[in-house]
Amino acid sequence: MMSFSVLQVKRLQPELITPAKSTPQETKFLSDIDDQESLRVQIPIIMCYKDNPSLNKNRNPVKAIREALSRALVYYYPLAGRLREGPNRKLVVDCNGEGILFVEASADVTLEQLGDKILPPCPLLEEFLYNFPGSDGIIDCPLLLIQVTCLTCGGFILALRLNHTMCDAAGLLLFLTAIAEMARGAHAPSILPVWERELLFARDPPRITCAHHEYEDVIGHSDGSYASSNQSNMVQRSFYFGAKEMRVLRKQIPPHLISTCSTFDLITACLWKCRTLALNINPKEAVRVSCIVNARGKHNNVRLPLGYYGNAFAFPAAISKAEPLCKNPLGYALELVKKAKATMNEEYLRSVADLLVLRGRPQYSSTGSYLIVSDNTRVGFGDVNFGWGQPVFAGPVKALDLISFYVQHKNNTEDGILVPMCLPSSAMERFQQELERITQEPKEDICNNLRSTSQ
């Protein structure tokens, strides 16, 4: 593997990609789910593609994606606009067609040489997604930054940064799929976008009908936890959950939970427990984990159009005192995670929108120890095909402070899940030790496995 101290990425000056045709000049309101303080962030995504001459016929990926992006913006024209702030900090989209920031780049490296450096927490992210000065604000800035970097092997890396108030992961996928379809020759997206953010406005009058631990300050928390850690001391590391890890974890849960427990539930319970142990939290302190739950689909009964690309999720929180979470078997945490997720339905989402309006769009609570997890393994980023086939990796590239993203990853032998974590450096070492301990096969199982493979 090459030395990345000598990696050279050459970038052309950024340009603004505008819609290929004239689009409406208007102002659009965000939903009350979009317009919350915790979504005023930029989310980075990376997608890595091999050269595929049999499919792309030596086309230039930068040219193909640039042209397709411009055509897709005719349909998704609000993304070419700018956010403005109205009375009481209410966000609106000025659909002025100013455009998306686009960067063409090249790097003297192959995908093979990059190896796992493209995986979360992606130490080379700043090379493949350069933060141009003045581009990363929430108000009056481009809503998307896209950098396409061509590699010497013929492959390329598409990295982007999204203003989260505009879309969630499912909404971003709709936009990326539209670009990909047009890059492959389509005249229009197969799923037409739907704005209709009024579908997730607060009710009139607003009324909070559910408990929302994710927005409530916990009482009696100590100041020695994650929330007060020196941000300069934070480190990122990713952890892999494959067949072996999941097998060991499943052996630790009670029989009545096995058939109803998802991989996401089990990993979340494991991370919550190990993280709490690693942070040495006061046993009497309340600790929380929130699971981001998509409102789309039959399970949650939220009726949204197929092409709706706004934020449509909530993150109900499980809460426990640190002592029982750390001392009880894994099934304790698992049951709390499952119960929290089960609270998500249309009424819960409506109650969130009402709470945000009544309380001035608060951020999720940061008191005490808090972890937020988002399952991106089934979003579909890995299916986005610009004409070069499927990406070798696609998804979020790092954790964001309290938020960890689960991403699909295939190592040399199997499909698994990669989870980036962000913790103080001392806690990260303890977290790794706790995770290794809880996912370690018992010695008798190792011996049995060796006997079965030798027969």
From Swiss-Prot:
This is Alcohol acyl transferase 1 allele RGa. Highly expressed in the cortex and skin of ripe fruit. Keywords: Transferase. The keyword Transcription does not apply. Repressed by metal ions, zinc ions having the strongest impact, and magnesium, cobalt, nickel, manganese and calcium ions acting as partial inhibitors. Strongly inhibited by p-chloromercuribenzoic acid (PCMB) and, to a lower extent, by dithiothreitol. Optimum pH is 7-9. The gene is AAT1RGA. Disulfide bonds: none annotated. Signal peptide: none annotated. Gene3D superfamilies: Chloramphenicol acetyltransferase-like domain. Its EC number is 2.3.1.-. GO terms for biological process: alcohol metabolic process; fruit ripening, climacteric; response to ethylene. It catalyses: butan-1-ol + acetyl-CoA = butyl acetate + CoA; hexan-1-ol + acetyl-CoA = hexyl acetate + CoA; 2-methylbutan-1-ol + acetyl-CoA = 2-methylbutyl acetate + CoA; hexan-1-ol + butanoyl-CoA = hexyl butanoate + CoA.
